[in-house]
Amino acid sequence: MLVSIYRYNPETDAKPAMQDIEVDIPAGKDLMVLDVLALAKEKDSSIAYRRSCREGVCGSDGMNINGRNGLACITPISEAVKPGGKLALRPLPGLPVVRDLVVDMEIFYKQFEKVKPYLINDDPTPATERLQSPQQREKLDGLYECILCACCSTSCPSFWWNPDKFIGPAGLLQAYRFLADSRDTAASERLAGLKDPFSVFRCRGIMNCVAVCPKGL
């Protein structure tokens, strides 16, 4: 299989380039993209990329796979590449490239931080944990599972246009996660923080974020 990998080191390269590497795929095996990338790295050890859990939990290996953002560790090549086709790997769009497939996540984290993604409760601390009914807890399903891979925000044109201002899909999801939490007492404060033009109102309903989320959020 031919693998085309985005190569760029801002400290030494004048501009990015795609490097083609031929890798041998074991017959009858449907490897994950991360496995193919590891085979390519065996041929060129200078290729830089992030990876950790290999199970779609840590979110560290988010990248653009044949034009679609996703996690390399849980994307099978049968899903990403047409028969006889090429596998093209690029960094997540819209974020500064540190090197090759590694991007600087600082802007993403700063926008995420704006929504105060943690429980706020000014009531006296109870002797035990703050309880919820099963129905209250159920409202959080589909909200809390975000793994901060940034596949959603870096698929969003509004984030590309205003990465230093727009909270982005991941931040908006977490904002609602705590608005929906019966234990949180900062609803008014949270809603006030979402009224500026670069929060909820910057979302254009394009839905790229939903299409690429590895957790189906």
Question: Which role fits each region the language model picked out?
Answer:
Residues M1-V3:
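Short structural boundary motif marking the start of a folded domain
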Residues I5-E11:
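Short polar catalytic/cofactor-binding loops
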Residues M18-L31:
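Short, contiguous acidic and Ser/Thr-rich linear segments
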Residues D24, N64-R68:
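Short strand-turn-strand beta-turns centered on an Asx-Gly dipeptide
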Residues D30-S46, L87-L217:
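Ferredoxin-type iron-sulfur electron-transfer modules in oxidoreductases and energy-metabolism complexes
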Residues C53-G62:
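Short, structured protein-protein interaction patches enriched in aromatics and acidic/basic residues
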Residues R68-P83, L87-L89:
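Glycine-rich phosphate/adenylate-binding loop and adjacent beta-alpha elements
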